[in-house]
Regions:
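Short amphipathic alpha-helical interface segments
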Residues: 2-32
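Alpha-helix N-cap/helix-initiation sites
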Residues: 3-4, 21-22, 37, 89, ...
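Non-catalytic, well-ordered alpha-helical scaffold segments
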Residues: 4-8, 38-41, 50, 73, ...
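Generic structural signal for hydrophobic core residues of well-folded globular domains
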Residues: 11-17, 47, 83-86
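Short, surface-exposed loop/turn segments at secondary-structure junctions
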Residues: 25-30, 59-66
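Short amphipathic alpha-helical interaction segments
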Residues: 34-58, 69-70
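Short acidic DE-rich linear segments
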Residues: 99-106
């Protein structure tokens, strides 16, 4: 579950930065999101490979290991769609949970 929260937070940050002329890239870090460097890099690489983000350069470390270098990170249309779908799903979940809380026999 923590991975999906991190994915959502990274995409939200990149979406927010679309409106900034000079984004604070220090916030795009493991330290900012309070996760390990290893987890952060892994999630960033997955987001890139899935087409949710762009603007990073992959650096092969040998074998299946990669690092990345941010060039001009940005959210893609696919990343925006992910945010929209997950925001809608959260709203639907809250609505259904609220209905269940009000009418416990249903």
């Amino acid at each position: 579950m923590a991975n999906f929260k991190l994915i959502y937070q990274i995409l939200m940050l990149l979406d927010k930065y679309l409106d900034h002329d000079d984004p604070d890239w220090s916030k795009l870090s493991a330290e900012h999101f309070r996760v390990t460097e290893k987890r952060f890099k892994h999630i960033m690489l997955m987001l890139y490979e899935a087409g949710y983000i762009d603007g990073i350069e992959l650096i092969p470390l040998g074998g299946n290991a990669y690092d990345f270098k941010p060039i001009n990170p940005s959210i893609t249309l696919r990343g925006m769609e992910y945010l929209e779908e997950n925001t809608t799903m959260k709203k639907a979940y809250r609505l259904l949970k609220g209905i269940k809380d009000i009418t416990p026999r249903i």
